[in-house]
Amino acid sequence: SHVATDNYAGGVEAGKLMGKLLHGKGTVAIISYPALQSVVARVDGFKKGLSDTPDIKIVAEQPGITRAEALTTAQNIMQANANLNGLFGFGDDAALAAVIAAKSAHNDNIKIIGFDGMKEARDAVDSEKTFAAVIRQYPDQMGAKAIDAAVDHLNGKPVEKMIPVQPGVYTGK
């Protein structure tokens, strides 16, 4: 069995939330990592979540694998799109880098959404105006479901090939 976050569902939640945060209109960018299937699922989900808001345009989708690369990517995107309204980072490092880029671009109104939910990102959602939300993964639930599946298998019960864990949304304390 493969126990993992439902990355597509998390992306859909991020896209829907971005649509609400931008009141259905504006421009957004995506920092991605197209070599990873989990990230492709997140980005595809994000686009699906935005599909109900046709007045939001995706103006850039560029890779930024490490935090340093994501910072350069975010800076380049914001320089080319001075009035960028939103940015989806495929992971917390990409989103945290985008927060720094937004500060240096003096863009206090951009809405940034990340994905993973590590403590540093949740703290930044609490303290940074531009970091609007993070899609949270739940490794404790993944571990519990993996143990349950292993026990079921050892007891001769059928086990699903894929066991998705639904992500959550963190928008602050």
Q: Where would I find each of the regions flagged by the language model?
A:
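A residue-level marker of the well-folded mature domains of exported/periplasmic proteins
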Residues: 1-173
